[in-house]
Amino acid sequence: MAVPGSLAECGYIRTVLGQQILGHLDSSSLALPSEARLRLAGSSGRGDPAARSQRIQEQVQQTLARRGRSSAVSGNLHRTSSVPEYVYKLHVVENDFVGRQSPVTRDYDMLKAGMTATYGSRWGRAAAQYSSQKSVEERSWRQPLRRLEISPDSSPERAHYGHSEYQYAWRSHVVPGGRLTLPRYARSEILGLRQAGTARRPPGCGSFSDAVFDNGPLKPTMPTHPPGTSHSAGSLLEETTVRVSQARLQSTQSRTARSSWPRSSVRSSLREPGRMLTTAGQAAVGSGDAHGDRSVFADAQLGNADIEMTLERAVNMLDADHVPVSKISAAATFIQHESFQKSEARKRVNQLRGIPKLLQLLKLQNEDVQRAACGALRNLVFEDNDNKLEVAELNGVPRLLQVLKQTRDLETKKQITGLLWNLSSSDKLKHLMITEALLTLTESVIIPFSGWPEGDYPKANGLLDFDIFYNVTGCLRNMSSAGPDGRKMMRRCDGLIDSLVHYVRGTIADYQPDDKATENCVCILHNLSYQLEAELPEKYSQSIYMQNRNIQTNSNKSIGCFGSRSRKLKEQYQDLQMPEERSNPHGIEWLWHSIVIRMYLSLIAKSTRNYTQEASLGALQNLTAGGGPIPTLVARMVVQKENGLQHTRKMLHVGDPSVKKTAVSLLRNLSRNLSLQNEIAKETLPDLVSIIPDTVPSTDLLIETTASACYTLNNLMQNSYQNARDLLNTGGLQKIMTISIGEGYAPNKASKAASVLLYSLWAHTELHHAYKKAQFKKTDFVNSRTAKAYHSLKD
């Protein structure tokens, strides 16, 4: 049963875990026997105080022994922190963005001593700060007892983001204010009076294809997507290449450099004494000659002689006869090192036919060789589409998956999953990845690490850790953009959606909404909710939409001059009895379930990661697009049951323009429900007016946001005289008229939307006197420009 939390936990509720969890604690042996039993035992000669003390010590020792065995065998009580392991390593530094270097300053020993540790989230545009006053052991053994089941009452204070510049693996564009932003992964189109056209992309963002993450050039023709849906269209990017230190070149027995691989071109390396770390941007401005920078390293097995290693020599050593395994590993490590910072080196290795040789090394039952080969391949395919295709054509994906299932070396698994992430960024390989890798990745990584279906919490064990799970979710995030067929296959994958939902709910319950793997999971769910109505399997559509087919379309009553857009038909749709929810949803049923709706609203309120917020808003936007039972059910749930408007309206005032645009798009979909319009207007009208600029918007993103705001206001004004009067009283009409005029003879979407709104406002004859009193005249509302815009939407 849910019970309110303490004042310190405002916005959350707690639920009691099931009895089966308590069964694992097994601490009842700490209780002493009753005095009666002690006296009875005394008759056997063991009732003296010394015997009693001995029994207590024996019981304590037995309990500690059981706990020790439990920790070694079972991970049921273990929970991973969202802070990756490499953060605690003092000698590992992560440089994520050029222009901002914030090496980790706290290590594992400091955490054990109870000192505060902070780290950058390395994923969004801000660096979220985390701290801990407990030891790592305490946090890893603490069993969380809270589950967030409703959207919190209020959102936390939003972090303030400063000016920073980012460098990415692909083109970026500059927004007003000089801030460099990466192209968004998500694109949204809004449900209007008729299908909206395809939005223009910012320069350098690629094409609006049905692939979620495309980084190719703009295509001559762009497909039109169903209006009202949120569609991902940017590139998720690839995993970063791994830089190998000089010490690694000298000893192939050392571990590969640990790193996290976020969506930007992040490079991680081992800290070298007295040497600055090299980031992707620094490498880019350095030497690009694959042969000019030659590394000299000592190999003990070559008699400690200094050998000048080149790419040619390294590639030749990969398959030479009678070459010791240690030299093969060293050669692969050298290739990994060289291809880290030089795109020319990646191309040169391909020309030397090094990729087939590296793939052949996967057959060797040697962890060092496999690890080095996978690391080299991961760097070779980074930002190199030809190398990606080469790996795929050589049947590399099945080989990698085979090693992933067989090896017990965590570092090798990290290299493989990082390599698969890079491969999945290629549009040409996404379907191949879904066909060959989806099932294995789900069964081998996603399900076991998430803790589903046992109901356990996300945990690491001897075979998996957070970085591996994070890499796989990044790979699946790319794969979820593979178009309709790919989405359908992923929805049908048994256990995938269940595990993703279970993991996200677990991080929310642990007060970790900014977990970077959570962002990946939510983006996958967002993509899988795209076009959900149209792509539902037949068994669901037959049961859920049967009532839709039985609408009285043969009624003699007129349904209005605009067909399916008329008010009467909308009322018939919305008067339908909503389909009942299953108490135990499975698979695709999670996508529209009330638990997931609350999960999205919780992330909107609690997360400070822009992409997590945008994906959550976009998923709700997808689910509310359309006129069937599911969109209507979700809209009512968001507005009436879960108090979702308060969280959505706050997103209208965030600094990130894409989050703001997606929030307006969601409100536009919600405003199409007649029964919700007055409530939406009461809650959000001042906010919608406030985000409309005073002048004609000039950027594509601001144009889209302004157009969505005007269309939302139009939905709210059409059927309500009071809402139209409230709009007049806000003082926003002058801004709307300014935007309606636009830029002469080339009106954009925003000016067209403003014109439609003005034309609709004049239809309220009761307000004509109020308009004139406010110094407005009829021609401000009805003229050739507004009439043309209004009637063009009705055609």
UniProtKB/Swiss-Prot annotation:
Its main location: nucleus. Residues 197-233, 245-274 are annotated as: Disordered. Residues 1-318 are annotated as: Required for binding to single-stranded DNA. The modification Omega-N-methylarginine is found at R46. It is found in: Nucleus; Cell junction, Desmosome; Cell junction; Cytoplasm. InterPro entries: ARM-like, ARM-type_fold, Armadillo, Plakophilin/d_Catenin. GO terms for molecular function: alpha-catenin binding; DNA binding; intermediate filament binding; molecular adaptor activity; protein kinase C binding. Residues 245-257 have a biased composition (Polar residues). The modification Phosphoserine is found at S44, S82, S132, S135, S151, S154, S155, S172, S188, S232, S265, S287. Expressed in cardiomyocytes in the heart (at protein level). Belongs to the beta-catenin family. Interacts with DSC2. Interacts with JUP. Interacts with KRT5/CK5, KRT8/CK8, KRT14/CK14, KRT18/CK18 and VIM. Interacts (via N-terminus) with MARK3/C-TAK1. Interacts with DSP. Interacts with DSG1, DSG2 and DSG3. Interacts (via N-terminus) with CTNNB1. Interacts with CDH1. Interacts with the RNA polymerase III (Pol III) complex proteins POLR3A/RPC155, POLR3F/RPC39 and POLR3C/RPC82. Interacts with CTNNA3. Interacts (via N-terminus) with SCN5A/Nav1.5. Interacts with ANK3/ANKG and GJA1/CX43. This is Plakophilin-2. It comes from Mus musculus (Mouse). The gene is Pkp2.
